[in-house]
Amino acid sequence: TQLTGFHHTRGMLCAMKRPKLRDPAALLQDASRVAVLENVMNPTNLGAIFRSAAALGMDAVLLTSAGSDPLYRRAVRVSMGTVFQVPWAYLPEDWTALLHTLGFRTAAMALQDDSVRLDDPRLAAERKLAVVMGTEGDGLADETIAACDFTVRIPMHHGVDSLNVAAASAVAFYALGKV
């Protein structure tokens, strides 16, 4: 517990070198469906998003620098190791311009008056699509929403207006991924 910060019940410990950070432009060359996470802070949510991305056909996960570290032990654990399977990279400040230059259309998951439903056929028809998810609580920045091609909402019942970012990502990846 002195080394890890918590009690191990299974007696296993592994020390690894961090992988070299990937270039997002190179990572996106052959991708058609990617997740963009803007400032997702909770490592549990981050791990769950990686697991959903792996299971539901996303080619990569792209992160802003202010979010949680995918290699944080809780994120790795919740992801069931998929942070080592799904390619990921940190994005530059002008990431929307990078995605657009590489031919991606961007879909901001946000509750706005002009939001289209997740099942809008235009979204699934896009050859290259980035699904953009925001931080817990605050969601996406207004500037991010304005820079995206689509604003998208998940239709819901019983007066519920939003889902946790990990749950919303699973729904969005299922609808828009390569399943």
Placement of each model-derived feature along the sequence:
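Structured adenosyl-cofactor binding patch, chiefly the S-adenosyl-L-methionine
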Residues: 11-14, 52-56, 67-84, 142-179
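Active-site/ligand-binding-proximal alpha/beta "capping" segment
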Residues: 108-160
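Short, charged, surface-exposed secondary-structure boundary motifs
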Residues: 3, 98, 118, 162-166
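RNA substrate-binding interface of SAM-dependent RNA methyltransferases
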Residues: 16-114
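N-terminal positively charged helical leader segments and presequences
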Residues: 1-4, 105
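A short acidic, glycine/proline-enriched capping/turn motif at secondary-structure boundaries
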Residues: 1-2, 9, 19-22
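Short, well-ordered secondary-structure micro-motifs
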Residues: 4, 73-75, 101, 117-122, ...
